[in-house]
Amino acid sequence: AYAALIRDLDERGMLDSTLVVLATEFGRKPQFNGNGRGHYPICFCSVLAGGGVKRGFVYGSSDKEGAYPDNPVTVNDLHATIGWAAGLPLEKVFHTGTGRPFVVGGVKAKPVHQLFA
């Protein structure tokens, strides 16, 4: 379904102006513990396409066990990257519908500019 979405957006000429993000909130432990592999927030992946993202580009890697990233991108950095791509001011305080304040990506977050052409 993901590939079909990307292909459809590309064929319609909409991919360059649409950022598609496929992300999870955690990875899986490198070791099997008998019941599965459990949640593992230290090393996981996300996929970005369109919206100026370089095609076929891979950013970062992990050690051979898949336990630790060599160039970690925090969840806040990912949020800042998405916000930057969408043209949002990263320093501005926004408020949710219930009044909760938040900053896109957080105060120390940095967009990963290397992802973009």
Each model region followed by its residue ranges:
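Ligand-binding pockets and gating/stacking loops
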Residues: A1-A117
